[in-house]
Amino acid sequence: MSLSTEAKAKIVAEFGRDANDTGSSEVQIALLTAEINHLQGHFSEHKKDHHSRRGLLRKVSSRRNLLDYLKRKDVARYTALIERLGLRR
Protein backbone atom coordinates (compact mmCIF):
# COMPACT_ATOMS: atom_id res chain seq x y z
CA MET A 1 0.00 0.00 0.00
CA SER A 2 1.35 3.40 -0.92
CA LEU A 3 1.16 6.59 1.09
CA SER A 4 -2.15 8.41 1.43
CA THR A 5 -2.73 11.70 -0.36
CA GLU A 6 -2.69 13.56 2.95
CA ALA A 7 0.65 12.03 3.94
CA LYS A 8 2.16 12.96 0.58
CA ALA A 9 0.83 16.52 0.85
CA LYS A 10 2.34 16.84 4.32
CA ILE A 11 5.75 15.67 3.06
CA VAL A 12 5.58 18.04 0.07
CA ALA A 13 4.70 20.94 2.39
CA GLU A 14 7.56 20.08 4.74
CA PHE A 15 10.33 19.48 2.20
CA GLY A 16 9.17 21.44 -0.86
CA ARG A 17 9.88 25.02 -1.76
CA ASP A 18 6.13 25.67 -2.06
CA ALA A 19 2.89 23.68 -1.86
CA ASN A 20 3.09 22.52 -5.49
CA ASP A 21 6.77 21.57 -5.52
CA THR A 22 6.62 17.84 -6.14
CA GLY A 23 9.60 17.50 -8.46
CA SER A 24 12.53 18.75 -6.43
CA SER A 25 15.07 16.18 -5.34
CA GLU A 26 14.39 16.80 -1.66
CA VAL A 27 10.67 16.06 -2.02
CA GLN A 28 11.26 12.96 -4.13
CA ILE A 29 13.81 11.61 -1.64
CA ALA A 30 11.52 12.35 1.32
CA LEU A 31 8.59 10.57 -0.38
CA LEU A 32 10.74 7.55 -1.20
CA THR A 33 12.02 7.46 2.39
CA ALA A 34 8.47 7.44 3.75
CA GLU A 35 7.49 4.63 1.37
CA ILE A 36 10.61 2.64 2.29
CA ASN A 37 9.88 3.03 6.00
CA HIS A 38 6.30 1.87 5.42
CA LEU A 39 7.49 -1.20 3.51
CA GLN A 40 10.02 -2.09 6.21
CA GLY A 41 7.15 -2.38 8.66
CA HIS A 42 5.37 -4.65 6.20
CA PHE A 43 8.38 -6.97 6.02
CA SER A 44 8.61 -7.38 9.77
CA GLU A 45 5.26 -9.17 9.52
CA HIS A 46 5.55 -10.76 6.05
CA LYS A 47 9.08 -12.10 5.87
CA LYS A 48 8.56 -14.22 2.74
CA ASP A 49 6.99 -11.53 0.56
CA HIS A 50 9.76 -11.51 -2.02
CA HIS A 51 7.68 -9.83 -4.70
CA SER A 52 7.24 -6.72 -2.58
CA ARG A 53 10.87 -6.90 -1.47
CA ARG A 54 11.88 -6.38 -5.09
CA GLY A 55 9.80 -3.19 -5.12
CA LEU A 56 11.49 -2.07 -1.90
CA LEU A 57 14.95 -2.59 -3.40
CA ARG A 58 13.89 -0.61 -6.46
CA LYS A 59 12.78 2.31 -4.27
CA VAL A 60 16.04 2.15 -2.29
CA SER A 61 18.03 2.23 -5.52
CA SER A 62 16.02 5.17 -6.83
CA ARG A 63 16.57 7.07 -3.57
CA ARG A 64 20.29 6.28 -3.72
CA ASN A 65 20.52 7.71 -7.25
CA LEU A 66 18.65 10.87 -6.25
CA LEU A 67 20.89 11.31 -3.19
CA ASP A 68 24.00 10.92 -5.36
CA TYR A 69 22.63 13.50 -7.81
CA LEU A 70 21.87 15.97 -5.01
CA LYS A 71 25.32 15.44 -3.49
CA ARG A 72 26.93 16.20 -6.87
CA LYS A 73 24.85 19.34 -7.43
CA ASP A 74 24.64 20.90 -3.96
CA VAL A 75 26.43 19.40 -0.96
CA ALA A 76 24.82 21.79 1.54
CA ARG A 77 21.28 20.76 0.54
CA TYR A 78 22.38 17.10 0.61
CA THR A 79 23.77 17.25 4.14
CA ALA A 80 20.76 19.22 5.41
CA LEU A 81 18.37 16.67 3.90
CA ILE A 82 20.05 13.56 5.28
CA GLU A 83 20.11 15.15 8.73
CA ARG A 84 16.39 16.01 8.52
CA LEU A 85 15.50 12.51 7.34
CA GLY A 86 17.84 10.76 9.76
CA LEU A 87 19.63 8.77 7.07
CA ARG A 88 23.06 7.26 7.67
CA ARG A 89 25.88 8.79 5.60
From Swiss-Prot:
Signal peptide: none annotated. GO terms for biological process: translation. Keywords: Ribonucleoprotein, Ribosomal protein, RNA-binding, rRNA-binding. The keyword Transmembrane does not apply. Pfam families: Ribosomal_S15. The keyword Oxidoreductase does not apply. GO terms for cellular component: cytosolic small ribosomal subunit. Belongs to the universal ribosomal protein uS15 family. PANTHER family: RIBOSOMAL PROTEIN S15, BACTERIAL AND ORGANELLAR (PTHR23321), SMALL RIBOSOMAL SUBUNIT PROTEIN US15M (PTHR23321:SF26). This is Small ribosomal subunit protein uS15. It comes from Proteus mirabilis (strain HI4320). The gene is rpsO.
